[in-house]
């Protein structure tokens, strides 16, 4: 042992350790790369306060932030997917289901709840994109029909938040059949004269965009959401042409008249309440809370 080691051993020195930061405290914006405090991002409804990028949000969080606190009642939670075709690609479908259920805590890619919005009774549905890309299965179709039936029973509006890659290929024709099934259910809602508002979020593609997502009495999109049937890369490869900038994004679609409105997520709740109060001939709700404002909007106002 050297002389310096002997001195150090004799002295009562407290060793310093690196301060460990718990996992999940910080996250990074997918768009601008800004490092964000996780709790602050959640308070801002998963919208980056720096660049206003709308990150993906869980289905359950969407519904909890939409409906009045304590009013939520889940519908169709007993419906579970089954691998009736014994489908297998690079992985067995039943194994994909187990993995998706474990990762998301959901049984399938659509969550349905009834409740109130500023005191107005509504039924709301939301896709869970993290569950096999929010793909439409027979259970998703059945839950959506359950949502329509509940709206008919309660004589109230229906709101649906779409975030999906389209029909679930592992269920083949049974999945494609849900396009017709959900569209037929919405026709009953229209016959009754009950409002259906469709909110398209990033991404809304394939069979979902070709059915229930574009059948709203009013179609609202979040900023810069990708909305279409086939993706832009597939279209470019097929037509062998360069697509225009922003093709299939919300801003492009509203210019072409394909959607009715673009609404920021923090303003969505109040916007939906205002629209539904007018469509159902109810008094305009009184809004106490103010929607969060991004740094981009602050700079624009200045």
UniProtKB/Swiss-Prot annotation:
Localization: Cytoplasm
Region ranges (Disordered): 281-302
Gene giving rise to this polypeptide: accD
Protein name: Acetyl-coenzyme A carboxylase carboxyl transferase subunit beta
Species of provenance: Serratia proteamaculans (strain 568)
Cofactor note: Binds 1 zinc ion per subunit.
Gene Ontology BP term (one): fatty acid biosynthetic process
Main localization (coarse): cytoplasm
Single GO MF annotation: acetyl-CoA carboxylase activity
């Amino acid at each position: 042992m050297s002389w310096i080691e002997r001195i150090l051993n004799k002295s009562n020195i407290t060793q310093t350790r690196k301060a460990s930061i718990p996992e999940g405290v910080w996250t990074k914006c997918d768009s601008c790369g800004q490092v964000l405090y996780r709790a602050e991002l959640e308070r801002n409804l998963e919208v980056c306060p720096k660049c206003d990028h709308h990150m993906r949000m869980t289905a359950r969080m969407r519904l909890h932030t939409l409906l009045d606190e304590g009013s939520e009642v889940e519908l169709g939670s007993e419906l579970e997917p089954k691998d009736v075709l014994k489908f297998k690609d690079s992985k067995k479908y039943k194994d994909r289901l187990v993995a998706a259920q474990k990762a998301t805590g959901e049984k399938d890619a659509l969550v349905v709840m009834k409740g109130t919005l500023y005191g107005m009774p509504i039924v709301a549905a939301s896709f869970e994109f993290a569950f096999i890309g929010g793909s439409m299965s027979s259970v998703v179709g059945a839950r959506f029909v359950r949502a329509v039936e509940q709206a008919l029973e309660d004589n109230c509006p229906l709101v649906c938040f779409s975030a999906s890659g389209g029909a679930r290929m592992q269920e083949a024709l049974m999945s494609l059949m849900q396009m017709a099934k959900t569209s037929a259910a919405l026709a009953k809602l229209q016959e009754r004269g009950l409002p259906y508002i469709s909110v398209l979020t990033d991404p809304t593609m394939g069979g979902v965009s070709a059915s229930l997502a574009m059948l709203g009495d009013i179609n609202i999109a979040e900023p810069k959401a990708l909305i279409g049937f086939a993706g832009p890369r597939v279209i470019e490869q097929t037509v062998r042409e360069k697509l225009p900038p922003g093709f299939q994004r919300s801003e492009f679609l509203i210019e072409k008249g394909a959607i009715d409105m673009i609404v920021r997520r923090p303003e969505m709740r109040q916007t939906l309440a205002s629209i539904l109060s007018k469509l159902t001939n109810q008094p305009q709700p009184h809004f106490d809370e103010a929607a969060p404002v991004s740094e981009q909007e602050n700079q624009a106002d200045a």
